[in-house]
From Swiss-Prot:
It comes from Acomys cahirinus (Cairo spiny mouse). Residues 113-373 form the GS catalytic domain. Palmitoylated; undergoes autopalmitoylation. Acetylated by EP300/p300; acetylation is stimulated by increased glutamine levels and promotes ubiquitin-mediated proteasomal degradation. The modification N-acetylalanine is found at residue 2. Keywords: Acetylation, Angiogenesis, ATP-binding, Cell membrane, Cytoplasm, Endoplasmic reticulum, Ligase, Lipoprotein, Magnesium, Manganese, Membrane, Metal-binding, Microsome, Mitochondrion, Nucleotide-binding, Palmitate, Phosphoprotein, Transferase, Ubl conjugation. It catalyses: L-glutamate + NH4(+) + ATP = L-glutamine + ADP + phosphate + H(+); L-cysteinyl-[protein] + hexadecanoyl-CoA = S-hexadecanoyl-L-cysteinyl-[protein] + CoA. The keyword Membrane applies. Mn(2+) 2 binds at residues 136, 196, 203. The gene is GLUL. Residues 2-25 are annotated as: Required for glutamine-induced ubiquitination by CRL4(CRBN) and proteasomal degradation. This is Glutamine synthetase. One of its GO terms (biological process) is intracellular ammonium homeostasis. ADP binds at residues 336-338. It is found in: Cytoplasm, Cytosol; Microsome; Mitochondrion; Cell membrane. The modification Phosphoserine is found at residue 343.
Length: 373
């Protein structure tokens, strides 16, 4: 399996420099979503002192013509800090800074989906929407070959790998453990991890997060994963169907509840929300991957624990349905439901906004409603 040249550099030499004192200065790594709607970019600046909150962080700029976000003739774009985390790579007092992107005219960039999501979340803040997202991903060599797979063939059939233990079942656990600890250090709300059904496929869970924070924490968790994989010389892909054939795809199952759903007899509100979702299936399919449903078409086949992309379905404990009500929720008659349709490479802001629009703002039809200021 091919690994990156950088992973073969002597890390001990790097550590000699990283252990040097930095005085009162702080390194802040600014992170943003690029013009693909999937890729992340970052760059670092020096601050004179440690910021205590995100409001103390300065705005910055970058060359949007090199990130698929603007033309070269008018390429300056703005980075507006919206979330701050501890930096697990440089350690305290250094920071990771997640940013929204704005164009030269101060309008949000096309892939800045956080801007509209924040507005929608503010409209329903009194209902306290909680989200939890289950991020699946696949580890690959730099040659695009799945990590740990035979160079001239395939591993044994699916079955022993889900939550598997042992060198012949768990491929890449060191990366998973490093990512988990780095997220905890950063302050990302990571709640668990497990090996998935396909070998070299893993999952981590983020949440519960209220409102806009769901997207903030998931994007930063993805960034940390990419950086950890960079150190190990491998790639983490969020492609929803990285290997064709009889192998599971990768999703980002999204769990959702409101205060009313979590309280006694909340199942009534869960069922009402599912009924609303059933009448707006195609709108959600378009929102649930960056290519308007084309990526998910490779994954949502009705096989490998997925629903069919053309049909809406719901059921208790049914992993072949669009919407799953966990068995414990059915028994306790309160809790949350799981939307199993979002793809692994979805934008969490698009997913959570769509759910709120349909379930809480009672929107119908195939287009989002345009609210006045």
């Amino acid at each position: 399996m091919a690994t990156s040249a950088s992973s073969h550099l002597n890390k001990g030499i790097k550590q000699m420099y990283m252990s040097l004192p930095q005085g009162e200065k702080v390194q802040a790594m600014y992170i943003w979503v690029d013009g693909t709607g999937e890729g992340l970019r970052c760059k670092t600046r020096t601050l004179d002192c440690e910021p205590k909150c995100v409001e103390e962080l300065p705005e910055w700029n970058f060359d949007g013509s090199s990130t698929f976000q603007s033309e070269g003739s008018n390429s300056d774009m703005y980075l507006s800090p919206v979330a701050m985390f501890r930096d697990p790579f440089r350690k305290e007092p250094n920071k990771l800074v997640f940013c929204e992107v704005f164009k030269y005219n101060r309008k949000p960039a096309e892939t800045n989906l956080r801007h509209s999501c924040k507005r929608i979340m503010d409209m329903v803040s009194n209902q306290h929407p909680w989200f939890g997202m289950e991020q699946e991903y696949t580890l690959m060599g730099t040659d695009g070959h799945p990590f740990g797979w035979p160079s001239n063939g395939f591993p044994g059939p699916q079955g022993p790998y889900y939550c598997g233990v042992g060198a012949d079942k768990a491929y890449g656990r060191d990366i998973v453990e490093a990512h988990y600890r780095a997220c905890l250090y950063a302050g990302v709300k990571i709640t668990g991890t497990n090996a998935e059904v396909m070998p070299a496929q893993w999952e981590f869970q983020i949440g519960p997060c209220e409102g806009i924070r769901m997207g903030d924490h998931l994007w930063v968790a993805r960034f940390i994963l990419h950086r950890v994989c960079e150190d190990f010389g491998v790639i983490a892909t969020f492609d929803p169907k990285p290997i064709p054939g009889n192998w599971n795809g990768a999703g980002c199952h999204t769990n959702f509840s409101t205060k009313a759903m979590r309280e006694e007899n909340g199942l009534k509100y869960i069922e009402e929300a599912i009924d609303k979702l059933s009448k707006r299936h195609q709108y959600h399919i378009r929102a649930y991957d960056p290519k308007g449903g084309l990526d998910n078409a490779r994954r949502l086949t009705g096989f490998h624990e997925t629903s069919n992309i053309n049909d809406f379905s719901a059921g208790v404990a049914n992993r072949g349905a669009s919407i799953r009500i966990p068995r414990t929720v059915g028994q306790e008659k309160r809790g949350y439901f799981e939307d199993r349709r979002p793809s692994a490479n979805c934008d969490p802001y698009a997913v959570t906004e769509a759910i709120v629009r349909t379930c809480l703002l009672n929107e119908t039809g195939n287009e989002p409603f345009q609210y006045k200021n």
